[in-house]
Amino acid sequence: MDSKTLQTLRRDAEDICRSAIEASVPDAAIQRALAQLPPCQGRTVLVSIGKAGWQTAKAAYDALGSTIEQGVVVTKYGHSQGPIGDLAIYEAGHPVPDEHSVRATEAALAAVSGLSARDRVLFLVSGGGSALFERPLVPLAELEDITGQMLVCGADITQINTIRKRLSGVKGGRFAQLCAPAHVYAILLSDVIGDPPDMIASGPAYPDSTTTAQAMALVSRYGLTLSPQALDLLEQEPPKVLDNVTTVITGSVAQLCRDAAARAEALGYRTCLLTDRLQCEAREAGRFLSAMAGTHAGKGEKTAYILGGETVVHLTGHGLGGRNQELALAAAEGLAGLEAVVASVGSDGTDGPTDAAGGITDGATADALTALGISIDQTLADNDAYHALKACGGLVVTGPTGTNVNDITVLLV
């Protein structure tokens, strides 16, 4: 195992991930979508929500300027980059909604109230909107608790949103109803595999496609504890038809993977897209990739295996980390001694409740951790990948990126 080769592979893996994320920043795509809008005879109100909420609002404001009469931006703490004209900018809680989420949402609802059929709402949506944009129909403390239960049990984003859209006064198409009779032009940056519009930020402006039976089955499957009030709400169907909405999707994990492949090819790698629909336990994905490395490493041809999607973590410990860090750490043992690297990075720059976007490990990581007295198995059991990767230089830190289109994972051999 050559250390210089590993250094090159690590550098290239980070380069591929960072380049793909930079290419997915939505400015140009948002402006292209806005250019297709029909003329507005009345007022234009902007509402932009999500972890990319500031970036998408800035792109829209740069394109439309003073034609936007009023606007509200809701993004995650630390993701605002300053004023945008006279738009009202709020930061709020993610992945669990908080009182700032509710306050910001009420400001948005005030902005769209009383509009006429001549007016329009530009609704810019990115991942994270489910927590950031909220009018709870149960006490906020209970909604926070239910969200926490689903995050801990390993439910995927579609399952989580199936539950929480029924507990909200703005999700599942209800925001669009509150905008009526104004027309809503929804421009979506997708962070949900397969790009189902009703699941992106829990579909505030899209008809619901789920059923009460599905929601109740999730309660049973995961043993969720809900109040009688919440259970009653699960029995109520969100809107199934909306006649005042036009929806466009401008970015997705599929494009993120294509951009990663293009950068890998530019660096001289043969590329193989394994999937842009990765959905499984993070550590199982990491172990699978290390097994692939065992088969393909050292065969002569430089190859980049690319995956996109969103893994899950079933929390059993009380450590610190995120799904991308856990994936990378889980790969480390199987990579030992190989000229191979696994990098996994969240496109929004945030992986779990940490300051890292993801993690990177290689054929030397396992020995480095052993020398530090760190057990990979115990660390995974504790869900403490952050501290292990930090100790061996395996964290990938980008800061907020201005986009959010799932995660990018790369295996280089």
Where are these regions (language model features)?
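An N-terminal, well-structured beta->alpha segment
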Residues: 1-47, 55-56
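A glycine- and small-aliphatic-rich helix-loop capping segment at beta-alpha/alpha-beta transitions
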Residues: 59-68, 86-89, 109, 113, ...
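Glycine-rich oxoanion-binding loops at beta->alpha junctions
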Residues: 74-117, 159, 164
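Proline/glycine-rich low-complexity loops and linkers
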Residues: 91, 96-100, 151-179, 351-379, ...
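Internal gly/pro-rich beta-alpha loop/helix module
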Residues: 139-225
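Active-site segments that bind and position negatively charged phosphate/pyrophosphate groups
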Residues: 268-344, 352-353
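Internal helix-turn-beta structural module
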Residues: 329-413
